[in-house]
Regions:
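Small-aliphatic-rich amphipathic alpha-helix that forms the alpha element of a beta-alpha
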Residues: 60-84, 105-113, 199, 203, ...
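Polyanion-binding loop/helix "lid" in catalytic or ligand-binding cores
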Residues: 182-224
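Short, surface-exposed beta-edge/turn micro-motifs
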Residues: 29, 155-156, 266-269
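Residue-level signal for inorganic ion chemistry
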Residues: 32, 71, 79, 118, ...
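Glycine-/charge-enriched secondary-structure boundary and capping motifs
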Residues: 2-15, 39, 93-117, 125-132, ...
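Short, compositionally biased
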Residues: 169-184
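Glycine-rich anion-binding loops of enzyme active sites
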Residues: 37-41, 48, 82-172, 295
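Extreme N-terminal cap/leader segments of soluble proteins
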Residues: 1-62, 78, 87, 115
Length: 322
């Protein structure tokens, strides 16, 4: 016989709250959060839906870890240190206890890796697909949060890691493309389990003028920066950093560049800064590739130049939530 809601909380989720006093062992109506003097609370929330944000063939522990990581990426973009989270899950009727046990083990693994703690939440049954939401809390020194609105004329635009891996990884998982076997494995892993750039975020507080995580696509998320900062951007296509697998795919078909620039789920950081040598030092310190891809310019458009200096246009700037 499956456990009831309260038995599931006691068995699978209460252990995740044991090390955080303010969680009150998940036995009160709400949790307690205290801020040190001189620190601000950063709050973000994300929802993932089966069949939309994850395919459904993933193991429950991977689903749990992706749920946390997409919001951890938001904290990273603002330079915040993870603190705690709440969890809301709507699961189909009849979801077995062993699914929840594996799901909670994934949460436990990433709590240990990223120093974050469960402090509350809710669970319900649904006749539809699984809907999973997490609200994350982080902290930053007062006035040090990196926002989208600080970019100014002449700033250099940088991006961490490589772009396009996750969107092609989704295509691999759906068997829509068939790349090299090793490329397939790497690209699919980038889609299924993103790596939030928390260490980079902490370093960017000293260097970046504006930042955003790349969840909806490079062009869309850079567009969020330019809109908030009331400026434009000029990007050089040949400077966009690609993994070897994505490079082979775009070399086979140059139309795939649109997917690189507008596909989401990379969870890298796009940011602006004035001091390129400072950013290079951060890259060396973290052993993380950080690439200059363009500059902030006047106007409001995000323009892309190809290798011949010609302007490129795309039908969509990135993923839009309906």
């Amino acid at each position: 016989m499956s456990k009831n809601e309260f038995e599931r909380i006691k068995s699978f989720f209460a252990p995740l709250a044991e090390s955080f006093d303010g969680a009150l062992s998940l036995k009160d109506d709400a949790a307690l959060l205290s801020m040190e003097v001189g620190r601000e609370l950063i709050v973000t929330t994300d929802t993932i839906v089966k069949g939309v944000h994850y395919i459904g063939d993933e193991t429950p522990d991977f689903i749990a870890r992706k749920l946390l990581r997409v919001s951890l990426s938001d904290l990273a973009a603002m330079g915040a240190e993870p603190l705690a989270y709440t969890l809301n899950i709507a699961l189909p009727h009849g979801t077995p206890d062993n699914w929840l046990e594996a799901f909670s083990s994934g949460l436990h693994a990433d709590q240990a890796e990223f120093g974050i703690h469960l402090i509350g939440g809710d669970s319900v049954s649904t006749p539809g697909p699984a809907v999973l939401s997490a609200t994350l809390f982080g902290t930053v020194k007062t006035g040090e949060a990196v926002r989208r609105s600080g970019a100014s004329l002449g700033d250099i635009i940088f991006v961490s890691g490589t772009i396009g891996d996750a969107t092609f990884g989704l295509s691999v998982a759906r068997q829509e493309i068939n790349a090299d076997k090793l490329d397939n494995k790497i690209l699919e892993a980038r889609y299924r389990l993103p790596q939030p750039r928390l260490r980079l975020g902490c370093c960017l507080k000293e260097a970046a003028t504006a930042a955003a995580d790349i969840s909806d696509g490079l062009l869309a998320d850079l567009g969020h920066i330019t809109e908030a900062s009331a400026c434009g951007a000029l990007i050089n296509l040949e400077n966009i950093p690609l993994s070897s697998g994505v490079r082979r795919l775009v070399d086979e078909d140059c139309d795939r560049w649109e997917k690189v620039l507008t596909g989401g789920d990379d969870y890298e950081i796009v940011f602006t800064a004035r001091n390129q040598s400072c950013v290079a030092d951060i890259s060396d310190k973290l052993n993380l590739p950080i690439t200059p891809i363009g500059r902030i310019v006047s106007g409001t458009a995000v323009d892309i130049l190809n290798s011949r200096g010609g302007a490129m246009t795309f039908e969509a700037a990135g993923y839009k939530h309906c």
